[in-house]
């Protein structure tokens, strides 16, 4: 699940409206889970012959770019002077994370894939130590340990049970963690909409070559799903920005874990997959660690 912009990258709210923030986050997380659902449908035979994750991620960036260009045409935000090096690094990480996440979602339950993606903020914290020089206290280390235990439960280590798909999801979380570091640097100097315009435009250029190498003509239903992956992701990101503009980041961040609830419901409704005990325990443990980290970050701010 491609992650939205982190709460710390948006300006402080002018007027606190927590009720509206909850509604915006409920809608945003439903859409974020929806992108993973669409990616799973595209990567399986639900809508036709399975499409390669390279092709799915290309569709995600292409149609997200079209959508955000339409938003930019209406809002007309000043573009300024973009830091192209940071944008390139951020986009490479985002493309890698999206591709790995789409591959994982096609091979494992949405609940497991979504829960493993919540390692992203934990890995961001770990990466911030060498890359941003941040100091980490005992509570944050405890949150990391709890989240990693949950991840190991979800990976089901043991003879014949270790999930390769889980490693793909872990790789996605690592790539998205690196992306979050670069996003923090970018949005300290650039506005969110121009960042999304440049990011998705670069993503199209990066994803085009790999997609052409594995291209399979999509069915009409798959074309609609490819459009949906991009448009739904952008809509979710914009709703997320509306949420963090109406409440403190520490209030909004824990609501992001509603994504896991939606993913579970979608997987059951569309694919008939009900999480087993291992999935539920692992998800609860991992989310507990990530939630502890989010709450501690909120107090620090």
Which sequence ranges carry the predicted segments?
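Juxtamembrane helix-loop-helix junctions in multi-pass membrane proteins
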Residues: 31-62, 178-202
């Amino acid at each position: 699940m491609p992650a939205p912009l982190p709460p710390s990258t948006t300006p402080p709210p002018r007027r606190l409206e927590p009720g509206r923030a909850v509604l915006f986050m409920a809608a945003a997380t439903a859409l974020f889970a929806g992108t993973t659902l669409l990616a799973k449908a595209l990567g399986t035979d639900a809508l036709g012959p399975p499409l390669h994750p390279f092709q799915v991620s290309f569709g995600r960036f292409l149609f997200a770019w079209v959508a955000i260009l339409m938003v930019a045409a209406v809002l007309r935000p000043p573009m300024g002077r973009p830091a192209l090096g940071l944008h390139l690094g951020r986009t490479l990480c985002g493309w890698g994370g999206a591709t790995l996440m789409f591959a994982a979602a096609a091979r494992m339950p949405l609940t497991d894939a979504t829960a493993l993606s919540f390692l992203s903020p934990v890995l961001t914290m770990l990466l911030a130590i060498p890359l941003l020089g941040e100091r980490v206290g005992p509570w944050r280390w405890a949150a990391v340990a709890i989240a990693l235990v949950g991840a190991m439960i979800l990976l089901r280590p043991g003879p014949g049970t270790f999930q390769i798909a889980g490693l793909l999801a872990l790789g996605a979380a690592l790539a998205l963690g690196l992306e979050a570091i670069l996003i923090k640097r970018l949005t300290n100097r650039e506005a969110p909409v121009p960042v999304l315009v440049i990011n998705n435009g670069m993503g199209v250029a990066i994803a085009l070559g790999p997609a052409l190498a594995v291209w399979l003509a999509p069915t009409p239903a798959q074309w609609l799903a490819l459009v949906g992956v991009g448009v739904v992701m952008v809509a979710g990101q914009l709703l997320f920005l509306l949420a963090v503009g109406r409440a403190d980041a520490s209030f909004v961040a824990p609501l992001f874990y509603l994504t896991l609830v939606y993913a579970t419901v979608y997987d059951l409704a569309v694919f008939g997959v009900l999480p087993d005990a291992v999935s539920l325990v692992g998800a609860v443990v991992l989310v507990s660690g990530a939630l502890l980290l989010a709450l501690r970050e909120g107090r620090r701010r």
